Amino acid sequence: MAVHRELVSAGKFDEKFRRALLDYYGYGYKPLASYDNWRRLNGILADYLDWAEEPGAVRFASADSEQMEENPFHRVYRFCKYKPVAYPATFLHTLALLSGEFSLRALPAAVQEDEERQMHLEDVLAAGGPFKTADLLALIGAGEARTLNNRLDDLATLGILVCEQQSGSRGGAGNRYWRRGQLTLAELVRCGEAVDVDFAQHLQTFLQFYGETLPCGVLGTFLLDRLGETGARPFRFKHAYFMQALHDFTAVDLLAAMEQGLWCRVVYRHGTSNLETELLCWPLELRRSTMQGRSHLLFYEPEHRSLASLRLEFIDAVYLYEDAVVRDGLGREAAELDADIARAQAMLPYVWGSSTGRTQAHNAAASPALQEVALCIRCDAKEEPYIARRLLRESRDGSVTFDERAGTATLRVTVCDAKEMRPWLRSFYGRILSCEGLEDVLAEDVAAMAAGHPQQERASGGERWQLSPELRARLGAGTQARTHEQLFNEVFSVYYQIMAEVFCGLSAEEDAAFCTEAELDARIRAALGAHYLKLGSETEHTLPQELVQTLLGGDLVERGSVTRRAAQRCVFKGEAQTVAALRSCYQCAPGLRFYRDVVPLSVLELRWLAAALADKRRACFLSDAETRALQALLVEKCPQLAPLALEKIVHIDRFHFPAEALAREQQVLPQILAALAQGRDLALCYRTRFAGRRCGRYTPLVLVYSLRDDRFQGRFCADNGEIVTLNLARIESVQLDAPSVGRAQAAEQATALRQAEWRAVTVQFADVRNLADRILTEFSPWQKRCSFDAEAGRYTLTLAYQQRDVWDITVRLMGYGAGIRFTDPAHEIAREVARRVREQARLFGE
């Protein structure tokens, strides 16, 4: 049996994947250890990340996220370990029998020896079910009923199968009957194509976009796997925190707890300090930062009556408790506990990021002590509209007013912890006239930056609590959350997909004859080639052997022989030979695709799809008629199914995008997508930043979406040969034009232009609490190099960036204040930061 070094069991996901990737990709440094993890991750992600071993035993993984067509960490979910032979064989047998798309060539020999059983099974097969567990066991021909029941239960939990339990004649449990789940992707596509013949293309772009931008987007990639992508992906994603896809493993458990009204015991281990603790909590909300890359769970903690937060990526395990069990264990008045939770929920709009107050203990026991912040900056809304727009889009829950006569803008916001705003406020240094509530803090900060003195910021709040042993004993162990097993599951692995494809090919009617070992190997190699972008470095070596063992050991094929003419130097002298051969035990129609036509959509896939169909941007990809048809189909087939509660995952620092700009994008985006898919140019008119108008013929190259900015830009080649970037919301009109000529050349020109715009900046920072974690997480989407001098306790980080992003990099680095030092004070970013700090010091001195 092949050794699966690139596969990881669901129980080891955190240890083998998430934490190792946090070290290699997020932090960018790792001492010599865990070589197996390094090799495993390199094998899975080598095509996407720049893996390098630096002198001094530093390992490093880096990437430019804007150059990636897809999230590389979604690949991790396709390498879930399974029990060889037995599990994939049972999966293929069961779906083939229940689907109605396959027919058995002959009943198993053991069945044919029992005439009564044979007649019963022939009737069941002719009627297409229902199938009892005993029926499936007899037809599959291997294993025990208990083992098969357990495996069928696993598939039922996914939603791929449905179990109907009958009552026994004496009141006990009777037979269990099995049928296939509610809806396949093929049915979904047929529903859409009844509305629009191009629906499959529309659905593909819909899934390509939402698979990269919605939480739990890996479910969208599973749907794309089923659909089968064609053509190049039209999207790129600017400074995307792809790493957050690994947090979905824990997020789905917490979402399930919130939906079901369950308490959680969270086992938590900090990634940098390695502090281990466990807490009891009532989960309230998940927060993701589009600016800094970190994710948090906000929750109510009952022992300290507190609204608090934890980094989502540092949660190792979640255990669930019924509400009544926790209330009994706490021994508190129900009204008091309910009031605490209500106050904690009401505080959420006042949490700027993740800090819930300067003091966390008992902050939910009474009305919270909120802080009023009034930021007044120098801003001429007419002469500097970009500053006005920035303040409006980044104000979160605050209100902004402008005084045109004074040339100022004022943001008023109420928060739990005003100090948490400090990194964002630094980006306005050089303009701040006053900041009520933080004036002394900012004045000290500016003085430290001007003097170049390193400054360690203390995290707000930060109490370290532990679930008391007494309460832990009263509550018991709880039930381990397992919703993540529906996300990281072998059914979605690339191994299963290739096995299913080969199985369908062997079963197709036009290929009903026996095939030799060499012919089977050719089929396997063809399937590997079709999935080559999904393979790990070891897949093509380990899978062929295992696939043959699955087919034979799982009774999916029957042995036989076939006559073939032996290969000779002279084809006329080849002699006929009888050689061993195999044939599928099933028959199916040619062209059948197992995951599209046979395997029903899982519960999580359906719920995620329902949530995506309700998103505000879906009209960019699907017409109203297409959306209504899909929503009606979901209601018809799955009436009890609710959309996945993605509204509980909040992108806290996402910019406000004007409704009228979104409406413009919805009007022009379908035309641009059609041009990209059909290889055509566009005739468009564009409103420039300074109220000008530009019209012409443009060749679309790629669409770039920023989750932080919540907007699309397009890269085009203009009719004069210039490579331009246009905001889609500024396009006034667009029409499909003639077929593109020279698109490949224009794409090469755009790539060369991007290469010419690379710049780099190097900063250093001390090994102080959480600073390395914050900086390296925020800059994880950029290509970078990081090293650590243990003797000096100092990190050196070199960031690569595009010249057009120099302002963005400047603002981000300013957020760390005196915590960082530029190695080259003459660098343009260092000079700009110094200029702003000097100007701010002058303003505070007036």
Question: Where are the regions a protein language model picked out?
Answer:
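Basic, short loop/linker segments at the boundary and entry of helix-turn-helix/winged-helix-like folds
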Residues: P72-F91, E485-E490
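Core beta-strand-centered patch of the WYL/Sm-like small regulatory domain
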Residues: V3, L7-R18, K30, L223-L375, ...
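Alpha-helical residues within the helix-turn-helix
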Residues: A138
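Long, low-complexity, charged/polar intrinsically disordered regions in eukaryotic proteins
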Residues: L21-Y82, S460-G478
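Bulky hydrophobic/aromatic content
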Residues: H4-N37, N42-D50, F91-D123, A127-T133, ...
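Short, Lys/Arg-rich nucleic-acid/phosphate-binding segment
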Residues: A57-S65, E164-R176
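Polybasic (Lys/Arg-rich)
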Residues: L7-K12, L22-G26, L337-R523, G560-R565, ...
